[in-house]
Amino acid sequence: MEINGVEIEDTYAEAFPIKIARVLITAATKRWALVAATEATGFATSVIMCPAEAGIERLASPSETPDGRPGVYVQICTFKYEALEEQLLERIGQCVLTAPTTAVFNGLPEAEKQFNVGFKLKFFADGMESETQIAGRKVYKVPIMEGDFLAEENIGAIAGIAGGNFFIFGDSQMTALTAAEAAVDTIAELEGTITPFPGGIVASGSKSGANKYKFLKATANERFCPSIKDKIENTEIPADVNAVYEIVINGLDEESIKAAMKAGIKAAVTVPGVKKISAGNYGGKLGKYQFKLHELF
């Protein structure tokens, strides 16, 4: 299969189950909503070494937020619900409560699983907290130096999916990077998914385990490293490719990830010099979800 003259390899992305909480952060301005969201989703690229995977899902206009202010939806992902609640308390408590003019609301109010994060955060007020209603939602008011921090009582979570992905092969580093940026920018407009790596782009895609250093649980995926393609017998790098970037996608459900992969790939192949699109899988060892590239189109 080719799209815009770019080969789409007949392969699939392998993904795995994960628990996802969705939080709506609002602030007086879009700038401060984004600052708080960026801080709250830091150090969360991969569960390989991070305590969570997290990222910004999308912006929310004042017309769709409970308090009528600019907002940002974020997703926070862990393997277990217990760890997810800890991450919510730590990230909201340290990165949102401390940020100017912010408030937090439940991004999954209909979810069966609910954490009483706002209820627990109210204890920061040391007895001076109070309750109010905003757009029919129970919210706690925590007095702080600038005024009041507002936190909805509960934050919802569901069983989602992590590890949807695709690889972009370019004739140069700048070609591949430009295509990856185009893909991430397009995915950022969609609902239900995040791209948790720096700027949404993975420069150092890994394989599970190691060939030599067995004490590591993930190491460089040498088959996709252009600088050593002449040294690797089973290299996946064509002669005319000199850089590869991976886009990793987590999402609330399969359809959201499929939509993000499709949109991202369509954006990437518009960049001249992109030679091929592929995806990462581990023969079923990593997860139960398979997103076949050809079936996306």
From Swiss-Prot:
A GO biological process held by the record: one-carbon metabolic process
Enzyme class: transferase
Pathway recorded for this protein: One-carbon metabolism; methanogenesis from CO(2); 5,10-methenyl-5,6,7,8-tetrahydromethanopterin from CO(2): step 2/3
The enzyme's E.C. designation: 2.3.1.101
One Pfam family, short name: FTR_C
Function according to Swiss-Prot or TrEMBL: Catalyzes the reversible transfer of a formyl group from formylmethanofuran (formyl-MFR) to tetrahydromethanopterin (H(4)MPT) to produce 5-formyl tetrahydromethanopterin (5-formyl-H(4)MPT) and methanofuran (MFR).
The protein's name in its UniProt record: Formylmethanofuran--tetrahydromethanopterin formyltransferase
Species, as recorded: Methanosarcina barkeri (strain Fusaro / DSM 804)
